[in-house]
A protein has these predicted regions:
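RNA/tRNA-interacting regions in translation and RNA-turnover enzymes
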Residues: 1-166
Length: 166
């Protein structure tokens, strides 16, 4: 999942937990009680979204929004699930994050979003660089591979280049 913010209200994204509880109004207009364990997306130190759950009303995209700040991220599935339960607020985004999304897909997701936007409007421009804060890396795993087994299992012979590229 990605979240788009009005760039006039979100210039620099930071992810953090606050040391004290506070209330936060989400996009659905509900005031939510945020505790010290809830991960928040912030514009510097101002909360703008509950990480992996829902954006905030104060940074939503409105009719006169012309520039966006995009956030494409993965979060710890257990952390998101715990926040969802504490807040009693399960969303489409939180359900996806609870399934341990592949962190390698965040950058391609933004590229896909930009492509779809330019397909709709050729005047769309990317005006900033991409920042990739990658806190978690999967270990590389090497597997023994038997091409004959793949050919037998699929019932067709697949050339090596196709196998390597997929």
């Amino acid at each position: 999942p990605m979240h788009a913010f009005d760039s006039r209200k979100v210039e620099k994204i930071r992810i953090k937990r606050f040391g004290t509880p506070f209330t936060f109004q989400t996009l659905d207009g509900v005031e939510r009680n945020i505790d010290e364990n809830t991960l928040m997306i912030c514009n510097d130190n101002t909360p703008v979204a509950i990480a992996g759950i829902m954006g905030g009303l104060d940074s939503e995209i409105v009719d006169d929004t012309h520039t966006l700040t995009l956030e494409s991220a993965t979060f710890n599935a257990v952390s998101i699930r715990k926040s969802t339960v504490r807040l009693a607020h399960r969303t489409d985004a939180s359900m996806r994050y609870e399934k341990c999304l592949d962190p390698e897909m965040t950058v391609p997701a933004i590229a896909r979003f930009v492509k779809l936007m330019t397909d709709v409007d050729k005047d769309v421009k990317v005006v900033s660089s991409l920042t990739d804060e990658y806190a978690f890396h999967y270990d590389t795993v090497e597997l023994d591979f038997d091409k004959a087994f793949v050919d037998k299992y699929t019932g067709i012979e697949i050339d090596n280049d196709t196998i390597i590229s997929t």
